[in-house]
């Protein structure tokens, strides 16, 4: 138990430091689009909202990391996986990442790219870290946390992967709607939802079979498209 708590604390601390610049920037970018908000008069409200968002993200990461470290290997999963296997599977990681990037581009990016561009940071340093940060957050929460939790509760790996994928896909749609993207229920929303589901189910299955390190590596490769789309 001490090892689980120690690993969870270290991971949460690292993600806390990693989260600050990105959450601060994206929260600022979101509020900047809200015409009802005045930074000159409501700075205190802005900071309170940012701290609440940071606290929520850290709570999710800490809970999911605890679940993952405590239950992953206990349930017979690969945990973080074999790092040597990851090194030996670079071609597969690249291939899977490219396929996921294409699926995501066709189902989401192609339709929403212009709306997402306003949220891209102007700092190249921040931009370079986006694929890693997004991948870490998604894999820790959706795979390490939710898949492990549901597998422990329902005793069925396949159901755990599907439920985790469904919940995370719906959560992402809710975030898009919150920031003004996909405000209405239409065919485009369904297309994005199905794309998110397919990708999440694949990554969930990869996590079960090969470990979190493998699903994380594939996710990072797929999310590199975010930088390419910014420049092109």
Enumerate the predicted regions with their spans:
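Alpha-helical transmembrane segments of multi-pass membrane proteins
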Residues: 12-35, 101-109
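Central hydrophobic cores of alpha-helical transmembrane segments in multi-pass inner-membrane proteins
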Residues: 60-73
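Alpha-helical transmembrane segments and their helix-start/interface "positive-inside/aromatic belt" motifs
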Residues: 1-15, 81-94, 213-218
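Transmembrane helix-loop-helix hairpins at the membrane interface
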Residues: 125-232
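Alpha-helical transmembrane segments
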Residues: 6-22, 92-100, 161-167
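Membrane-interface segments at the starts/ends of alpha-helical transmembrane spans
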Residues: 37-55, 187, 191
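Hydrophobic, membrane-facing alpha-helical anchors
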Residues: 6-11, 85, 114-122, 166-174, ...
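Juxtamembrane helix-loop-helix connectors linking adjacent transmembrane helices
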Residues: 39-43, 47, 70-135, 147, ...
């Amino acid at each position: 138990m001490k090892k689980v708590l120690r690993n969870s604390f270290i991971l949460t601390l690292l993600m806390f430091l990693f989260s600050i610049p990105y959450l601060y920037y994206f929260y600022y970018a979101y509020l900047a689009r809200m015409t009802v908000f005045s930074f000159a008069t409501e700075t205190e409200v802005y900071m309170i909202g940012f701290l609440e968002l940071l606290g929520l993200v850290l709570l999710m990461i800490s809970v999911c990391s605890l679940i993952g470290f405590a239950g992953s290997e206990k349930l017979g999963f690969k945990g973080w996986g074999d790092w040597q296997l990851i090194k030996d599977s670079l071609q597969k990681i690249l291939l899977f990442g490219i396929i996921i990037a294409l699926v995501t581009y066709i189902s989401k990016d192609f339709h929403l790219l212009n709306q997402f561009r306003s949220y891209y940071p102007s700092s190249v340093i921040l931009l370079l870290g986006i694929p890693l940060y997004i991948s870490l957050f998604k894999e820790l929460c959706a795979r390490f946390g939710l898949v492990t939790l549901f597998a422990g509760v329902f005793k069925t790996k396949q159901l755990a992967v599907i439920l985790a994928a469904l919940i995370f896909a719906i959560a992402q749609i809710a975030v898009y709607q919150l920031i003004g993207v996909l405000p209405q229920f239409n065919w485009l929303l369904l297309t994005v939802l199905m794309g998110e589901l397919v990708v999440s189910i694949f990554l969930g299955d990869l996590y079960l079979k090969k470990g979190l390190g493998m699903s994380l590596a594939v996710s990072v490769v797929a999310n590199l498209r975010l930088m390419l789309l910014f420049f092109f």
